[in-house]
């Protein structure tokens, strides 16, 4: 009987469902393991073959840990708010709720057909009011702690679409959708004060078992730098320009200042002569994204304001310019330019013929900026000092003059949290007519997202919720005061910041999760997902977790102890899979043609889990052939167990079986699934070479195969005579003593020439080795008629005979 994957996979999926095989009990006394997948956004396209790669890896580990006696938490849910559903609703007139519900059903069917061992009783959905009640509750805690505030922020405003766009939705100054012009415009937005946690977010990375490259991405994003804040008085006005610099020692070389076009001082300091030029430049700059503005390759542009500032140490007058390469969101929105020692400033000074003053010796500033070390020159009291000493001295001089101080700066900006969209969590805030604002009382949560078929943008920059009077207008029952609800919604990141906490206690109506359960399950032991979430999702989740830790709600400082990024599965030609290239592989087709176990086995066998690897039909077929070989080894044509499997051990497989258990166990620990599978193949090859296979060994093999290919694992386990599921069977162990052979092969040389290879017992003495060698027929023929001068025996290696 051939292995019929369709029949067998359906049979075991039904069995697991009916028996709730993977239900996690909160047995708080048992050792635990929490294996987490990055939950998917349920798009209309359904699952693609990239999804199962990470999911299979966590599933293997979850099944392996259950067999090792761990209490395993392995849940799944849906990150279902966000733009694509809203866009679909706008384009088709359908309700995003219906669209989302349908997509989740498809995803869930596909995931179940792949045999993942999720506890579906813990499923979460970020759009479920019982879930987002707690997302809103966390927002209120952030607000109460002073970490959520309203600020005027420059956003990407698209008048044609009537809404604000994220940076990712703007390409070359126009909207990605429709190609409409986009402008930078200041608008009131909710912002979360993530910068308050910058130092902790940086320091605690050191304690995490994460890829170093990913930690570096977070370090760079936070971008901590030490330097000084310096204050330049604007000539003939009360104004001051504050700059942050990591090199206050070069202040004598600061020959001009550059402000961002949006800087608050620009309009007040610009002289009449330059007003028109400055205005035109500001308008142009408002059409560019931050990315375009800071592109190093682009030609520098800028305009003089007509105003001057006074260098606080040299007393020299320096020009004040505006240029779009300076962003209002970074540092103070102004820089002191030292063209002799900074490439970007040098380029700007050359273009606009501004002074270049050398203050560190060692270069030729006629030709290029010098950015190396050296002694200070043309720098007053700093002359003769090297960099570090000069920095310290410069800060001291600035402090004495009241013109500066030591300062730490971060590239990290506070998190712009509001979206002018419908399909997101309502922000639980009311703005009252007396100018105050309060959060919605906690007992009134969840604040429900109203159902409406009017989800077109409002056109005013507010979200579509602003169109729904019944939602917006409120009256305080006690005082009769009128108020308006906040109409912005939360970004898609909000629900994914804390979902791993809700899995721990998903049905709790009274609190986010039971503290005892949080204490038992946290931190997550293994988190697998794509590297595209390296910064935003992981940084935001760490931030929320740290706030909850400070509030005494979670017991750990960090959410995810070990993190692993799976690689990307490419199309057959090593190109990224995409609909436009027509090279997308649908897992449904593979499950139908080859089986879920084959897909799981193949994706784990393709190569290292973190590598980008091209899909190959040949490789897929090879994985299926291996499962067929395993089946044929164990199962007769009539479906009974092969008579080759016996209960007596003739020891022929002792070594390879014990080596296999050792290798697979070690490889599973390091997520080296491709090499573990290679070793399972080696074992099956050896089984085909012998007449009898010892039953406990084949049972051990099936236990090792089952986490990778669980359906065939269960079926073979039942063929071996077991009535219960393989899920909680103990993981096989190996015997160190059987990893090595009792026999060794020695070589026998006569006068240095190889004459024989002989297998002998490991513990054979030198004398016995000599006897065995001299009685070998080949050796006898070689020494016939000769006198033996010397016999040298090296235990376990060789016997050398010298004869004349």
UniProtKB/Swiss-Prot annotation:
ATP binds at residue 579. It catalyses: tRNA(Leu) + L-leucine + ATP = L-leucyl-tRNA(Leu) + AMP + diphosphate. GO terms for cellular component: cytosol. Its main location: cytoplasm. A motif ('KMSKS' region) lies at residues 576-580. PROSITE patterns: AA_TRNA_LIGASE_I. Coiled coil: none annotated. Belongs to the class-I aminoacyl-tRNA synthetase family. This is Leucine--tRNA ligase. It comes from Staphylococcus aureus (strain Mu3 / ATCC 700698).
